[in-house]
């Protein structure tokens, strides 16, 4: 029987479908036991506002399209969504919003403030993503839940017992504002304009002046050496002598070292503890003494300038140098300053006691494992490898903050002064700074006094085991043993390759000796219309729901898929969304047309042009399925848009419309059924291929036609018999159609007007002669050439 779709698509049906999908349980993980299982290690976003911006949402739409495709290929997909609620981002936000300083108020109160702030955002954040039709399984237990933190602590305890964790007092990058150590990937660089100060030092042995240029005069009291390049003939005579450092007068050695650049400043370089990682490297290499002058709050703690901030110390020292005649000159300079990734405060390097995870000794093995993962696109593998090669320090994982997973260590202070770390057996969530130690810890410290560690983990220590959490290790459907690592895919942006991806690789290797997942899908950044990153401070953040309310979710999802190739940045473009809306309308109208005919129950004898269309669809389907399988949604979006609109609708439907209706009875019933059967076959298959990208309109149409959801259908490989058709015939028909349409347009004719002429075509095209005749309303269609050529290739003539 025929079906009648409503005249127009109505956006309100999207909300109705969302409720229906929820009722049908489509957002819950289902593991059948008989189908293969695949895990999408969904990036848990930082929760810093009540909604994500549209660029971020577009990437999550990509993940949803992949999940929907895999389900329609017979795969049980674990596609979780939960929030990253740990660490500095929320702490800094709460401090700024409420005007508090974390370490100046009770810890319990600050933690409560952070949790309440997060809770106030989460509901709307999740529901706004759901409005896009994202079919994730929402897990309310985010990274701050006892469930997740228990898993984090358990893996730490495992690493501890493997001898992969140690505590040490050593120089570490430090944020004075956040008052915590940072790891190398958490360091960002910002261009700043400053002064290069040329300062007089004295050579102790000769009394002569030497000039040293520095952008950090506040570190003069921390200077422990002066270096020059071994090949710099200006200074080789100073080797082994000593410099007197102003303004406090400490005496330091003058030494040769290749790190000095003869072409920068005067060629002499002061080494301070610590100006940057270069200083740190040279101090360690040359075994120089350490003079720490900056405290954890970013203030000078010794000497004449004690108690003032770094900025104030810089100004005071410059003033003192000027007054003493020791400041030769100043040059304006733009240089890169290391800053905290979260609050953007310039970093210092100070000596603190931290917990470290071993990583430097495993660099070669990690590079080898990077080659084992499949990167989409492949060029991003090298970005990871280059980062691994650049690492110089072990990973400091302890942080002196509050809203994060607590480090599960109690310290046993022995009567002899020894301080022994004691760890629980694991399996519970431990809060050592607040809770009583477990029995096994008490038992191990009978003769001492127990103190719970007050530190927390780096937030990347939590998120770097997301692949375990996503596999359901804490859930009833634990699929980890089935999927690890061969059936796990990590989708993420290129901006966190050196953090989330690297640390995930490190953790998997240290825990299991393998990679964390087989596939790595790298997406670009979502940008505004001008190609700029979206930031609240710029005022260019585009709300994810505004275009959905205007156009509907499917057109916006179409933009998300079509906006940029895999691995490249993608711009917000309302014109593409409008194209998506027009495409949706075209799909709706095609469906109304096809469904106006009763669906044939048996396959009839197809005409050559019917088989030609299916041959074309075979190639399109292969391309689309291959791209989806490679986690690419850009190619399917463009291929389906082109085929459905510009080949199936524009050419095939127009070609066989007369045959399908057969109002004049010029076609046989078999010919008519062949047209209708081919229309249904191509329409059904195309609709299923489109469903992952545009799930609302395709599901509504399918339910109207068949009374069930399209998302329960299978996307099978196209039948091999479809290849038997001659695609050349279909492409030739397209050329003939275009030539006749142009001919009519040039003469001001409607495409439906009769053309009192004979259409001359090739022998191949004669296989579609009858359809061409009634489509273009010509007198006849014959082989050969007529009097007037109407195309550029000499394929189409009139006579």
From Swiss-Prot:
Transferase listed as a keyword: no
Binding site for ATP: 536
Main location: cytoplasm
Family annotation (Gene3D superfamilies): HUPs, Isoleucyl-tRNA Synthetase, Domain 1
Record SUPFAM superfamilies: Anticodon-binding domain of a subclass of class I aminoacyl-tRNA synthetases, Nucleotidylyl transferase, ValRS/IleRS/LeuRS editing domain
Catalytic activity line of the entry: tRNA(Val) + L-valine + ATP = L-valyl-tRNA(Val) + AMP + diphosphate
CDD domains noted in UniProt: Anticodon_Ia_Val
GO cellular component, one term: cytosol
Cellular localisation: Cytoplasm
One GO molecular-function entry: ATP binding
Entry EC no(s): 6.1.1.9
Keywords annotated in UniProt: Aminoacyl-tRNA synthetase, ATP-binding, Cytoplasm, Ligase, Nucleotide-binding, Protein biosynthesis
Xref: InterPro entries: aa-tRNA-synth_Ia, Anticodon_Ia_Val, M/V/L/I-tRNA-synth_anticd-bd, Rossmann-like_a/b/a_fold, tRNAsynth_Ia_anticodon-bd, Val/Leu/Ile-tRNA-synth_edit, Valyl-tRNA_ligase
One of the protein's GO biological processes: valyl-tRNA aminoacylation
Broad EC category: ligase
Family classification: Belongs to the class-I aminoacyl-tRNA synthetase family. ValS type 2 subfamily.
NCBIfam families for this protein: PRK13208.1
Function: Catalyzes the attachment of valine to tRNA(Val). As ValRS can inadvertently accommodate and process structurally similar amino acids such as threonine, to avoid such errors, it has a 'posttransfer' editing activity that hydrolyzes mischarged Thr-tRNA(Val) in a tRNA-dependent manner.
Domain notes: ValRS has two distinct active sites: one for aminoacylation and one for editing. The misactivated threonine is translocated from the active site to the editing site.
Annotated PANTHER family: VALINE--TRNA LIGASE, CHLOROPLASTIC_MITOCHONDRIAL 2, VALYL-TRNA SYNTHETASES
Name of the protein described by the UniProt record: Valine--tRNA ligase
Provenance organism: Pyrobaculum aerophilum (strain ATCC 51768 / DSM 7523 / JCM 9630 / CIP 104966 / NBRC 100827 / IM2)
